[in-house]
Amino acid sequence: MRLRPLAALSVAAVSALLLAGCAGSGDTTATPEATATVAADLCSSAAPTGAASEGITVSGEVGSSPTVEITTPIDSTDLTLERTITVEGTGDALVAGDFVNYAITVVSGTTGEVLDQAGYEAGDLLPEQISPENGGQLFGCATVGSRLTIAGATSDETTPIVVYVIDVLGVTPTAAWGEPQAPVDGMPTVTLADDGTPSITIDTSATPPTETEVATLKKGDGYTVASGDTVLIQYRGARWSTGELFDGGDTWDGGSPYSAATTGFVAGFQKALAGQTGGSQGLVVITPADG
């Protein structure tokens, strides 16, 4: 696990940003120049539209489970992947690197049977980080609020054609968007850069707590995390004894948000995550017993 170095510490202070617990919410912005470049890169990877994807009728509100009708029989001959933007969203264009919140319905392209769906309720899905290589064929050139209809051939003889209806619900920021909370006396101090990167200041002369302590720095409005949920987080950790960051205790320095089940973390980190909401930022001081 990325957090195993905590086990070697006497006492550690960790600033953890919960971006999403199973699912997330919120908006993000980027500079126009950067957005134009990465959006163009993502657009170039988008699957083309075609007769198969255009011959599918999808009804219902974006963000709600759709009704899908295969109005024109789909010919799997030479079919690879086609995508039609069924509903054009009015939100920002997706760019490479975005963590996209989405809902998806999977339908048999031959029978019209719904095979699976998720994302229409909070906590169904984690955001997906997209790039030209990962998800670009599906999400390229789409905007928030769009509904995408995708048709593709499979190697499964029982379901040779699969249809996906994807609703683009939003983009999860990589920094907390929650409401600031009052600081807790005796805990380390956390200051934030403009991009949300935290700096941890510890009074190393003070006596550390004898039990793991948790404080909420920002309270988000997202899904409430339960034990065993998979979460998407940013974190930074420092040694109480020196105030210095420790190896392996950082996703901010050249890294990216990290996802795992809460039960995969050390006990102190599990205590910090349970009950938090998406968009929150917490501070936890972990004792050796919980590290």
Residues of each region from the PLM?
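Cross-family detector of peptidyl-prolyl cis-trans isomerase
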Residues: 2-291
